[in-house]
Amino acid sequence: MQGLPPSQNHLSGGTARVYPNLNPAAAVPVERDQIFRLTSFFDRYRLFRGQERSQYVPNSKYVFVRTTGGDTLLHPRYRHPAIAEGHPVLYAGEAQFDNGKLKWWSNGSGNYRPDPAHAAQAGLPMDQFYTYEDVLKGLHARPSEEKPASLQAKMLLGRNPVRSLPRRNGGR
């Protein structure tokens, strides 16, 4: 991987797709120390900001980018190009958290327009992924057993590298 341009790096045996910023004017300067970096520990997430040592518990909807360096950066209000400083990214979207738990995430980014087929590049759990179109339809608000048929079909056809996770509560 070292020495290759990001578009030639390999993720899970495939070539990574890098998404350019389609709206350079949206890459406005912002306070960089206000942008969060996401970390996870099992199914709990924490945010770190700038040089602070404090951890924050995410508890709202955030705009995120996955940089070509592998960091997931987020902010509740800044736009994707501002967070990424206009640079190309591995993925961009929105993520909703509830007291440190990821509820859902999507490819909702009009400036990068990442496709669902490369959603695994975001580094977030695929079982909580919804396409932007599904979010607009409100399908992300349904119980997890009612995954949209369009996404289920893609998973079954192997278009998205999704691992099945065992169900909790004895399979109910």
Language-model regions: role of each:
Residues 2-171:
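Eukaryotic phosphoinositide-binding membrane-targeting regions
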